[in-house]
Amino acid sequence: MSKDDQAVSAGRRPFLTRTLGLLSTLPFLSACATGSRGEAAGSDSGGGFAFGIVGDIPYSRAQEAEYARVISEMNARDLAFVAHIGDAMADPRLYERLPAEARMPCTDENFAYVLGTFQSIRHPVVLTPGDNDWSDVVQFKKTKMDPLERLQKLRAMFYPKGRSLGQNTMGVDSQAQDPAWAKFVENLTWKVQGLRFATLHIVGSNDNSRTSPEEYKERQAANIAWLKRAFAAAKAESSPGLVLITHANPEFENRWTRSYASRYARSVRGADAPKAPPAAPYDAFLDALIVEMQDYSKPVLYVHGDTHIYRTGKPLHNPKTQRFFENLTRLETFGWPDSAWVRVAVNPGSRELFEIHPEYAPANSPNFRAG
């Protein structure tokens, strides 16, 4: 979702976003036992490595050139993989306002372009979808598309069985290996040097909850089940931590106390927080995450995009202790109009485990160019 579109959706986002403008561990454990899938090449346990995060780009034809520079920079680095957190194309409303400046989103041709950019990356690549990639086609006024048909096409194009995308692929496991969740090929898991990763298909724009409530409920149940399996696997494997990668900003503030929320709201807008946040489509997932975190003491990195503001922090509140979880770090990557990426170094000798480095291509920034 673009920054222009954030203004459009401000009325839809609840609470501070508005104020601010053990289940079965199959397939995780089977992969661990065999070492044949879901494990990046050369990933002996215990060493350090780095991976790349990018997302919410490219939206415009001008940004495509900037994205090419980002890809060139990532290709020049030693990375275990690259994760694109979704919204790999423009919002339909942006396209219809400026059709000469962006590709028409969610067409087969645009999907092919996006896939081509992923295949130009020399590292393994994984995608977790965003709302621009399928659910926001309902925003078209001049074109009719079915979001569920587009989701089906996205799944068919971007999720080869058992492998990542990219020039050098890695083995991955999918939630679809469980017959109970056979359609959710996009929920992936893998390991690098003993560290467990998992993607969860949660998108912006209210997670498709208003357009297709039944699809949303089914996918939410799948995501919660996948979340529980990720934590169970991380514990069973003695993983040094856990990395969760998704698209949507899950609105952590919706689970803050009013005292915390009021202080935060005043610090950025001089406004008070509402007495109680309205229900949001991400609440059930956040509640499940809180429950898992209450029984997990190792570092967790929660990666997302959606609101296009690079930031890190400790935003998940524990209602039992009335404190924020020190061992969960949020990382939101850059997004349109900024064309940059984030390198995460995994350092087993560090208490935090994750060392986060924003990476800029100077030619992509008017700030650098002005200097």
Sequence positions of predicted segments:
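N-terminal active-site segment of His-dependent metallophosphoesterases
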Residues: 36-108, 239
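Extended active-site neighborhood of metal-dependent phosphoesterases/phosphodiesterases
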Residues: 99-222, 226, 316-345
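Active-site environment of divalent metal-dependent phosphoester hydrolases
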Residues: 60-62, 90-93, 129-138, 205-210, ...
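N-terminal secretory signal peptides
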Residues: 1-14, 21-28
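Structural recognition of the beta-strand scaffold that forms the well-ordered cores
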Residues: 50-54, 80-85, 90, 124-129, ...
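Binuclear metal-dependent phosphoesterase catalytic core
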Residues: 307-371
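His/acidic metal-ligating clusters that form di-metal
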Residues: 75-81, 191, 196-198, 211-316
